[in-house]
Swiss-Prot record:
Protein species of origin: Parabacteroides distasonis (strain ATCC 8503 / DSM 20701 / CIP 104284 / JCM 5825 / NCTC 11152)
Gene3D superfamilies: Vaccinia Virus protein VP39
Protein name: Ribosomal RNA small subunit methyltransferase G
GO cellular component terms given for this protein: cytosol
Taxonomic superkingdom: Bacteria
Binding site for S-adenosyl-L-methionine: 95, 100, 146-147, 159
Keyword Acetylation listed: no
Record SUPFAM superfamilies: S-adenosyl-L-methionine-dependent methyltransferases
Function: Specifically methylates the N7 position of a guanine in 16S rRNA.
PANTHER family reported in the protein's UniProt record: S-ADENOSYL-L-METHIONINE-DEPENDENT METHYLTRANSFERASES SUPERFAMILY PROTEIN (PTHR31760:SF0)
Broad enzyme group: transferase
Homology family: Belongs to the methyltransferase superfamily. RNA methyltransferase RsmG family.
One GO MF term attached to the UniProt entry: rRNA (guanine-N7-)-methyltransferase activity
Subcellular location per the Swiss-Prot or TrEMBL entry: Cytoplasm
Phylogenetic lineage: Bacteria, Pseudomonadati, Bacteroidota, Bacteroidia, Bacteroidales
């Protein structure tokens, strides 16, 4: 079990040393033009790190690794369409896999703590190694099932892990009562396809937003971000 902060690891301010395709990185910076040099450095490092780790432990479809930034990093940041976390917030990423959406969000919100949870230990190993390599100081990891995690958080985020009703059952226990953000504490998840039936039990509470309204790439045509207050 891994349940500890990541050690600091300083990085040089030079994105040119990474083999990231320029077209991919320009997609990211076009939507997030206010990134600091530090954040650009951290995002740029993800390409080589995930390419290397993915050859050993499959956390991203090997056919899709070339689309790391639009399909995984930018998609993770689609959470910001619903909410930008205030400093001091705490967020659990349930079913993080190799670190999505938690690691891209942790880079963007350095004053928010992200706790990344997954039931598959080797995937947690990848996420931890990536976080250590880029010097993320605001993340912790735990190898466990969501039902086993008892800590409290302002929000839980998730990316296409399971049906909405199942997610709500698991994470309701993890939501703090005290609120500091613009939205009441709850669940924010990234979903795809037709969600009318899935959202039906929460129709009086849930908010669903189409990512295609913010991101112009074809990949986002059917992608949504869904919020349920808990």
């Amino acid at each position: 079990m891994i349940d500890k902060p990541i050690n600091r690891c300083p990085m040089e301010q030079n994105t040119e040393k990474f083999s990231i395709p320029n077209s991919q990185f320009s997609i990211l910076t076009s939507y997030f033009p206010d990134l600091t040099d530090r954040q650009k450095e951290q995002y740029a490092a993800l390409y080589d790190l995930y390419t290397d780790w993915n050859a050993k432990i499959n956390v991203i479809s090997r056919k899709d690794i070339e689309n790391l930034y639009p399909h995984h990093v930018l998609h993770s940041l689609g959470i910001t369409d619903m909410l930008r976390f205030k400093p001091g917030s705490s967020v659990m990423d349930l079913g993080t896999g190799g670190g999505f959406p938690g690691i891209p969000l942790a880079i963007l919100f350095p004053e928010t703590h992200f706790h990344l949870v997954d039931s598959i230990g080797k995937k947690i190993k990848v996420g931890q190694a990536v976080a250590e390599a880029i010097g993320l100081e605001n993340v912790s990891f735990r190898h466990c099932r969501g039902e086993e995690e008892k800590q409290l958080f302002d929000f839980v985020v998730s990316r296409a892990v399971m049906p909405l009703a199942d997610l709500v059952k698991i994470v309701r226990k993890n939501i703090k009562k005290e609120q500091i953000n613009a939205l009441p504490n709850g669940l924010i998840c990234l979903k795809g396809g037709e969600l009318a039936h899935e959202i039906l039990p929460f129709r009086n509470q849930a908010i669903s937003m189409d990512l295609k309204d913010h991101f112009k790439e074809e990949f986002f045509e059917t992608k949504k971000v869904v919020y349920v207050p808990l």
